[in-house]
């Protein structure tokens, strides 16, 4: 009970100090995740940052990479992480789903692909620590990397 009160006060403080951002799904314009800036809100030169994420919606069906290497720790709840499998020629041949439960810790490069699928009965909270930006991010579609903006614009056009 005391820990719950501390957590509530902490997140209320972050929100009251403009350290909460709701990231919208850019296709359906629905809330995708809540990001709480634990460290720097506007990082430009510092080599890493620390966020708490509360996932509100699953990722799109295609796997994506990230602009930075990152580490993530599941704090509460969990999710299915779909990870692509590749053949010896670098072609995607399938995906496997792994349940990521509280306590799961993972370090990934900026070129690691995955997608998150939520269990509708579980709220996923993670500690997310991105490193320095290495590249733009995008999605893997039919064994081809598609830049984030192009991918989302294509999805938006196909959803209308």
Please give the residue ranges for each predicted region.
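A short, N-terminal "cap"/entry segment at the start of jelly-roll beta-barrel domains
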Residues: 1-47
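Conserved short histidine dyad/triad with adjacent acidic residue
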Residues: 51-66, 110
């Amino acid at each position: 009970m005391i820990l719950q009160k501390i957590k509530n006060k902490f997140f209320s403080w972050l929100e009251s100090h403009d350290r909460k951002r709701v990231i919208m799904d850019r296709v359906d314009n629905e809330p995708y995740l809540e990001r709480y800036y634990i460290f720097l809100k506007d990082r430009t030169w510092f080599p890493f940052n620390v966020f708490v994420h509360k996932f509100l919606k699953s990722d799109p069906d295609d796997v994506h990479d990230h602009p930075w290497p990152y580490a993530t720790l599941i704090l509460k709840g969990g999710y299915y992480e779909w990870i692509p499998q590749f053949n010896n020629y670098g072609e995607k041949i399938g995906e496997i789903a792994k349940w990521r439960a509280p306590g799961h810790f993972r370090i990934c490069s900026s070129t690691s692909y995955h997608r998150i699928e939520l269990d509708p009965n579980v709220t996923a909270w993670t500690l997310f620590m991105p490193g320095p930006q290495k590249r733009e991010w995008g999605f893997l579609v039919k064994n081809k990397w598609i830049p984030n903006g192009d991918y989302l614009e294509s999805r938006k056009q196909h959803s209308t």
